[in-house]
């Protein structure tokens, strides 16, 4: 399901003469038409799968499917990462068995590939420039975004300013050190999901992970929920949206747009 974008442009005076109409905006931004919804994508910069010698990074479907779902709705997207520059892609996510319509579209889209090769460094990003944030997964976030103080501060800032924060698969690792205004874990008492222990075990990587997401979220006091392995499943709890696995990435994007549409309608 796709949710329409709604924008409200207030304070415009319409005057007419000689068969023309002119809009006089109350602010300069209105002169350029309705404000576009702006969403920040934060991706991993980490490309090493523990001590295995194998490469990791973004699971490309978790980037591509939400990216095109949102872009097709007219959303303006900025892509950032801890280090900036080239964002690594997990080579396993590029295997034919993991190909989807969204990933095929990505590999035929040189402009978006170029954007993923030139991400903005997190230290150049400000929450005030965006309406929401989305974190795609892949195993990379388990190492860098889980421990990145700039990422944690950014998530906290979005949340404190009543802006949605969304994550899929391994990306909830980025919530590991995020606190609320009282100093408690942001996920405490909230309904969340993530890549599960059994999904990690099925992939044969339990021992390679620095921690298990399901365990970490439960230890932080989250009300952890999950569906059967590999099934689409996503949860919204207030401003926090989480999805279980790659199959859940579009669900997360849909829930994110639902929150933004609701927020715009209430303005």
Segments and roles (model prediction):
Residues 1-6:
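Positively charged n-region of N-terminal signal peptides that target proteins for export
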Residues 7-17:
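Bacterial N-terminal signal peptides
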Residues 20-22:
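Sec/Tat signal peptide C-region and signal peptidase I cleavage site
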Residues 24-161, 173-267:
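Extended, subdomain-level signal for the structured scaffold at the beginning of enzyme domains
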Residues 162-166:
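Conserved, well-structured core segments that form or line functional sites
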Residues 169-171:
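Catalytic nucleophile serine of serine hydrolases
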């Amino acid at each position: 399901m796709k949710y329409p974008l709604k924008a409200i442009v207030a304070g415009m005076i319409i005057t007419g003469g000689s068969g023309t109409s002119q809009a006089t905006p109350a602010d300069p931004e209105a002169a350029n038409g309705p404000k576009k919804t702006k969403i920040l994508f934060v991706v991993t910069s980490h490309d090493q799968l523990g001590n295995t010698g194998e490469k990791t990074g973004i699971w490309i479907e978790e980037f591509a499917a939400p990216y095109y779902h949102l872009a097709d709705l007219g959303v303006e997207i900025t892509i950032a990462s801890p280090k900036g520059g080239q964002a690594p892609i997990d080579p396993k996510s590029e295997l034919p068995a993991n190909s989807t319509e969204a990933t095929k579209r990505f590999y035929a889209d040189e402009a978006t590939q170029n954007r993923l090769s030139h991400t903005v460094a997190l230290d150049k990003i400000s929450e005030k420039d965006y309406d929401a944030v989305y974190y795609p997964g892949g195993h990379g976030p388990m190492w860098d975004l889980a421990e990145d103080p700039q990422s944690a501060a950014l998530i906290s800032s979005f949340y404190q300013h009543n802006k949605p924060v969304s994550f899929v698969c391994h990306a909830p690792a980025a919530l590991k050190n995020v606190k609320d205004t009282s100093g408690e874990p942001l996920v405490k008492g909230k309904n969340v999901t993530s890549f599960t222990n059994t999904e990690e075990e099925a992939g044969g990587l339990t021992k390679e992970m620095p921690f298990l997401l399901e365990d970490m979220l439960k230890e932080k006091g989250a009300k952890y929920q999950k569906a059967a392995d590999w099934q689409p499943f996503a949860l919204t709890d207030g401003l926090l949206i989480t999805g279980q696995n790659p199959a859940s990435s579009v669900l997360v994007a849909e829930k994110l747009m639902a929150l933004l549409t609701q927020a715009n309608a209430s303005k």
